[in-house]
């Protein structure tokens, strides 16, 4: 029985990156051998075991044979006769197909039959063998790695293979859970735009996210968007979200906030009046199709509907500001308002020449919320009771008190209006 470190741990160590998790492959063993040594079986589709002390995963060396379309169409074979090279051959990229002895200290301890170390040096993402085409999830993984390793390029032959897979319909069989899983991971990488560049280049974006694909080539008003192209703007917004270290909820909201611009009638371009409502409808379809988690779905919906109003909040009076806060549910969920405003800031700064501009709307709306929170609702309700009021009338009094508090704040501070964003959104 021989044990080797494989995959991302070897790759990241060779790149000088932090190694958080270790993956191990075991050659020459049976499941009974592993159990006899105290390993805990946990694999559902193939033999994977947890180390009795470290709890790290150890997988028996295996081969995979395509038996149908999509992610699940595989027959897995494990036996003590499966070699390390055979196990590595089923992996997606050469940089992930390097093995090392458990106590490796240098290059002499590496087993690299497919040139992964060479591709690490050359900064190339290259498929291991033609069996890459058997799993369409690998298209998404290559795109995600492009977003992580921002100085790597996709090998031309790998890009061509991915295009062939899309043309042959393999991407049509991606299951929603895996699409979302890879999309979420890609959004959290240092340069998310590169994921979408790769997916567009191979044609997969039109399959998995046609609502996003159609944004390229859609013009916006240049006085608000010097970059003009909506797809280009979207990528700038995503990279700004990464730059500001936004959480996944915010990054997904950034991805989907302008979907409605892809359905703007051609005869009104480059204006996009009402795109916020259209974006929300398209967002709902995306979330249902990909089974997006509720926290991402809810934040993205608010951002899609309200980002234009938040951009223009400098033009809003007290009553309109309070209504905006209420629509954002900011009074009950002030922490979520921070994420809404962060997404809007990414939108505003994700424009050509605006990356270093301030976003005073954030401070203005937070100050308006503070004024609203200064209203003691129990005191207002008690006063309403003294007046013999109940039910909806109490709510109206609370709302009026909040509007007055914001009006007093606006008057006391003589708040200047932020730079207008117009209707560009």
Swiss-Prot record:
The gene is cca. This is Multifunctional CCA protein. Magnesium is required for nucleotidyltransferase activity. It catalyses: a tRNA precursor + 2 CTP + ATP = a tRNA with a 3' CCA end + 3 diphosphate; a tRNA with a 3' CCA end + 2 CTP + ATP = a tRNA with a 3' CCACCA end + 3 diphosphate. CDD domains: HDc (cd00077), NT_ClassII-CCAase (cd05398). Signal peptide: none annotated. Its EC number is 2.7.7.72, 3.1.3.-, 3.1.4.-. PANTHER family: MULTIFUNCTIONAL CCA PROTEIN (PTHR47545:SF1). PROSITE patterns: HD. It comes from Acidovorax ebreus (strain TPSY) (Diaphorobacter sp. (strain TPSY)). Residues 230-331 form the HD domain. Monomer. Can also form homodimers and oligomers. Catalyzes the addition and repair of the essential 3'-terminal CCA sequence in tRNAs without using a nucleic acid template. Adds these three nucleotides in the order of C, C, and A to the tRNA nucleotide-73, using CTP and ATP as substrates and producing inorganic pyrophosphate. tRNA 3'-terminal CCA addition is required both for tRNA processing and repair. Also involved in tRNA surveillance by mediating tandem CCA addition to generate a CCACCA at the 3' terminus of unstable tRNAs. While stable tRNAs receive only 3'-terminal CCA, unstable tRNAs are marked with CCACCA and rapidly degraded. GO terms for molecular function: ATP binding; CCA tRNA nucleotidyltransferase activity; cyclic-nucleotide phosphodiesterase activity; magnesium ion binding; phosphatase activity; tRNA binding. The keyword Metal-binding applies. A single active site specifically recognizes both ATP and CTP and is responsible for their addition. Mg(2+) binds at residues 21, 23. SUPFAM superfamilies: Nucleotidyltransferase, Poly A polymerase C-terminal region-like. ATP binds at residues 8, 11, 91, 141, 144. It comes from the Bacteria.
